[in-house]
């Protein structure tokens, strides 16, 4: 069986030097992710993306730059889970641990 090469990625974009509340910057980053052909799930500590790796990389770069436009410093991280042996989706991963 051939699977579409989806990846699941966890993204965190943190603006520094703008006080304790960063929600307005997080919202801007999420708006960028939603412009792309990606599944976007936000949680309390980051955002999980599902889709084509190239789309995720483009969206990540744009979201990082968008936040950096408003602040002097941004720390961003991107974790990518890519596999060839089975379909890789957020839903499959949650089912595997009994969370869905």
From Swiss-Prot:
- Kindly give the Gene3D superfamilies that the UniProt entry links to this protein: 3.30.70.930
Stated family? Belongs to the UPF0045 family.
The protein's name: UPF0045 protein MJ1052
Q: Which organism is it from?
A: Methanocaldococcus jannaschii (strain ATCC 43067 / DSM 2661 / JAL-1 / JCM 10045 / NBRC 100440) (Methanococcus jannaschii)
Lineage here is: Archaea, Methanobacteriati, Methanobacteriota, Methanomada group, Methanococci
């Amino acid at each position: 069986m051939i699977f579409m090469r989806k990846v699941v990625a966890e993204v965190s974009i943190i603006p520094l030097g703008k006080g304790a509340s960063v929600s307005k910057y997080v919202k801007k980053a999420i708006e960028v992710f939603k412009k792309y052909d990606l599944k976007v799930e936000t949680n309390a500590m980051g955002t999980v993306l599902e889709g084509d790796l190239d789309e995720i990389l483009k969206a990540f770069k744009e979201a990082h730059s968008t936040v950096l436009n408003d602040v002097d410093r941004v720390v961003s991280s991107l974790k990518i889970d890519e596999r060839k042996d089975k379909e890789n989706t957020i839903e499959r991963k949650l089912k595997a641990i009994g969370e869905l």
